[in-house]
Amino acid sequence: SPLNSERWYILPWDLDGSFKEAEHILHSRSDYAEWERGVSNYWGNVLFQRCLQTELYRNALAEAVDALYAKLTDGRLEAYAETYSALLKPYVYSGPDKKHVPLTSAQYDYVASSLVEEVKNNYAVYKQSYEKPMPFYIGVPEAKEQTVSVQWDTAYTFDAETVTYSFELADEYTFSNPIVKKTGLRIPTTEFQLPEAGQYFVRVIATDAGGETQTAFDC
């Protein structure tokens, strides 16, 4: 950011990952945890977290998002995609690049035509994310004789709703057959019998009074 300026310019390093939803659908791929969509994606940053907890800054963010959304859905994005596609496709689908293109020509057209719809979906996710609990961190499990205790941070909600938690322990990451499963926990801690030596996975999900859910950062 420039010196002697009251405005900060924050540029994400992963802009190359933007507008990938349609491509991921075509490849049956998902790179995102539940919390990585909407404002919860920034909750792990202390500065952003404090800003999001302040109504003044949330309103300022909403104004900026709404302004950007209006620009991206006024027809210009379709025009840009059409213009760039006409310029780039002849080169992309000719040698040697053609050997490394992850999409067919028809799939390329589908992705290009889906950009505005992705913007609309992302805007809806942004709005909805305020209705969900924010993600949280799970502490390091502690073994005590024949039991193990696990604690985690409280899940924040913007409406100060009551939150309950479910806890699962499994020996495989899909949690298809959990060894331990507890639901309706009202405090962010639980205990269970010490399992046999091995590799285990923990999952904690927060649920607010309205039924909205959120996973921990660590899940």
Question: At which residue positions do the language-model features occur?
Answer:
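Short beta-strand segments within Ig-like beta-sandwich modules, predominantly Fibronectin type-III
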Residues: V180-R186
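Middle-to-C-terminal accessory/interaction subdomains
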Residues: N4-T157, T162
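Surface-exposed, short loops/turns at beta-strand junctions within beta-sandwich domains
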Residues: F192-Q199
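Solvent-exposed loop/turn segments flanking beta-strands in beta-repeat/beta-sandwich domains
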Residues: A155-P178
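Asp-box/BNR beta-propeller loop motif
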Residues: D16, E172-P178, A197, A209-G211
